[in-house]
Amino acid sequence: MTWITPKKAIMLAAAAEGGTKLNAFDNALLKMGIGNVNLVKLSSVIPAHIEWLDELPKNIPIGMLLPTVYAHIESDEPGSTISAALGVGISEGNEGGLIYEYAGYCKREEAEDMVRKMVEEGFKVRGWKLKEFKVVSAEITVKEKPAAAVAAVIMFPY
């Protein structure tokens, strides 16, 4: 298998319910439009000069392997609020960047604050200058069915 450095990326987030926690996770992926592909989990370094997309490319083949950084949480505890967030930091000159993920029993704002702090620290320890910060998140309060919150950065080789 040959891996190609991704050229484009998109940030997505969704929350959903399902008959089981795994079905809730799958339903959140379907809401994002990535439920019929294989997510290949990555660590959190963004290639230089990546282009950020506003919408998913059309006609992504079923079963395609997509490099992904994602955070997720599932719960079946009624009344619990769960959130997932991804923070993306882009360096000056778009020479690369970092993605940090967080998921927990919390409100969306808490998850977003957490990833912002992580991105800032990641840049500081590398001696990089943060030019831009982006965040994507999802929140849901569990009712009668299990629920999931998922946030993802999907990368494309084309």
Swiss-Prot record:
Record keywords: Decarboxylase, Lyase, Pyruvate
Reactions accelerated catalytically: L-arginine + H(+) = agmatine + CO2
Modification sites for Pyruvic acid (Ser): 44
Chain positions of site Cleavage (non-hydrolytic): 43-44
InterPro entries in the record: Pyr-dep_his/arg-deCO2ase, Pyr-dep_his/arg-deCO2ase_sand, Pyruvoyl-dep_arg_deCO2ase
Cofactor or coenzyme needed: pyruvate
Disulfide bonds: none
Key word Lyase present: yes
Recorded GO MF terms: arginine decarboxylase activity
Entry EC no(s): 4.1.1.19
Cofactor detail note: Binds 1 pyruvoyl group covalently per subunit.
Keyword Transmembrane: no
GO biological process, one term: arginine catabolic process
Source domain of life: Archaea
Family named by the database record: Belongs to the PdaD family.
Name the UniProt record assigns to this protein: Pyruvoyl-dependent arginine decarboxylase
Gene that specifies this protein: pdaD
